[in-house]
């Protein structure tokens, strides 16, 4: 009989419909209800990208696509995917409970974010472990990060090189690659959190494989908390680089994200483009991984390597 293993795929979550926006935002704010102004601002950003974020459907396609890729590649183990979200149902705890009800005793978990941070991935893993410990009978093996997987680096390099082909050859010298991820509060540095170094390493590994001659590291989508966050912000970085180097082309590559959602469709495609338009440079962004076969193969390799090591 084939062994059955739970595949817990964790992600941030997004509102499914307009009525979800307030409770979703309240959850992000640890139970503090947002002001009407804050809700209107978030609703306005969703409106600017054409409605609600496509993230929910993409996360589903990634989770079930990964399940299929794992099961198609071997017949020793049957993986069963469960989606657990941080800020909306099905919550991480709901997914662990569903595994428990299905009689799953062994599971492997992956967060749909390649870099580890005590602030993000560790919080997901802790919630999953706490839920499993409370129910008893489920052992979850957690994957902490997967940014160094060679197929992940190659996937981004290929996408960047394809994007660079749209730029006239003689202007490639005036092109810069902006590699970015979600900013986090600066206080994580006090605890030697590996997150900033992991992003730097990702940028270095990708830059080694691309035809673009310049690159810079930026942060984006910081929270409105009043405390300092990791910088430079990608918009400030764009202005600074243009002012100093007069680059004609900016290729934005938000490698900390794996799907087209608000932070990419608004913070990059709208806000960064506003800045490139302002300075007279061209905006470019390679397609996000979403549930593309190359990305499902990245995830399959990550999970299978972790499971079999």
Curated annotation (Swiss-Prot):
E.C. numbers? 4.99.1.9
Q: Name one GO molecular function term.
A: metal ion binding
* UniProt key word Cytoplasm: yes
Database matches in Pfam families: Ferrochelatase
Q: Does the keyword ATP-binding apply?
A: no
Source organism, top-level taxon: Bacteria
List the InterPro entries hit by this protein, alphabetically. Answer: Ferrochelatase, Ferrochelatase_AS, Ferrochelatase_C, Ferrochelatase_N
Cellular component annotations (GO), alphabetically ordered: cytoplasm
EC class of the enzyme, as a word: lyase
Its pathway is:
Porphyrin-containing compound metabolism; protoheme biosynthesis
Instruction: Give the residues the record marks as binding Fe-coproporphyrin III.
Output: 12, 29, 45-46, 53, 124
Residues involved in Fe(2+) binding: 182, 263
Per the record, what are the reactions this protein catalyses? Fe-coproporphyrin III + 2 H(+) = coproporphyrin III + Fe(2+)
Q: Where in the cell is it found?
A: Cytoplasm
Which controlled-vocabulary keywords does the entry list? Cytoplasm, Heme biosynthesis, Iron, Lyase, Metal-binding, Porphyrin biosynthesis
Q: Major location, coarse class?
A: cytoplasm
Q: Name one GO biological process term.
A: heme biosynthetic process
Which NCBIfam families does this one have?
hemH, PRK12435.1
PANTHER family from the entry? FERROCHELATASE (PTHR11108), FERROCHELATASE, MITOCHONDRIAL (PTHR11108:SF1)
Q: Which family does it belong to?
A: Belongs to the ferrochelatase family.
What does this protein's UniProt record list under function?
Involved in coproporphyrin-dependent heme b biosynthesis. Catalyzes the insertion of ferrous iron into coproporphyrin III to form Fe-coproporphyrin III.
> What protein does this entry describe?
Coproporphyrin III ferrochelatase
Q: Which organism is it from?
A: Listeria innocua serovar 6a (strain ATCC BAA-680 / CLIP 11262)
Gene name, per UniProt, is cpfC
């Amino acid at each position: 009989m084939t062994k059955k293993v739970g595949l817990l795929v964790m992600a941030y979550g997004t509102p499914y419909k307009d009525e979800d926006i307030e409770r979703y935002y309240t959850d992000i704010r640890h139970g503090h209800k947002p002001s009407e102004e804050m809700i209107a601002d978030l609703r306005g950003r969703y409106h600017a990208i054409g409605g609600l974020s496509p993230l929910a459907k993409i996360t589903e396609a990634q989770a079930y696509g990964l399940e299929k890729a794992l099961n198609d590649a071997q017949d020793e183990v049957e993986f069963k995917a469960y989606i657990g979200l941080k800020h909306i149902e099905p919550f991480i705890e709901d997914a662990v409970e569903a595994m428990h009800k299905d009689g799953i005793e062994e599971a492997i978990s992956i967060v749909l974010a390649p870099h580890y941070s005590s602030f993000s991935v560790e919080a997901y893993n802790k919630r999953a472990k706490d839920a499993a410990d409370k129910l008893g009978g489920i052992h979850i093996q957690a994957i902490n990060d997967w940014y160094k997987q060679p197929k992940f680096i190659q996937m981004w390099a290929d996408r960047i090189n394809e994007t660079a082909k749209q730029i006239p050859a003689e202007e490639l010298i005036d092109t810069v690659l902006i590699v970015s991820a979600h900013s986090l509060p600066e206080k994580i540095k006090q605890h030697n959190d590996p997150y900033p170094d992991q992003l730097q390493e990702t940028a270095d590994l990708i830059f080694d494989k691309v035809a673009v001659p310049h690159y810079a590291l930026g942060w984006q989508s910081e929270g409105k908390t009043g405390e300092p966050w990791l910088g430079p912000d990608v918009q400030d970085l764009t202005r600074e680089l243009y002012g100093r180097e007069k680059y004609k082309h900016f290729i934005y590559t938000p490698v900390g994200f794996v799907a087209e959602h608000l932070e990419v469709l608004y913070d990059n495609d709208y806000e960064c483009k506003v800045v490139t338009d302002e300075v007279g440079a061209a905006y470019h962004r390679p397609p996000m991984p979403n549930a593309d076969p190359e990305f499902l193969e990245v995830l399959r390799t990550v999970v299978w390597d972790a499971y079999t090591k």
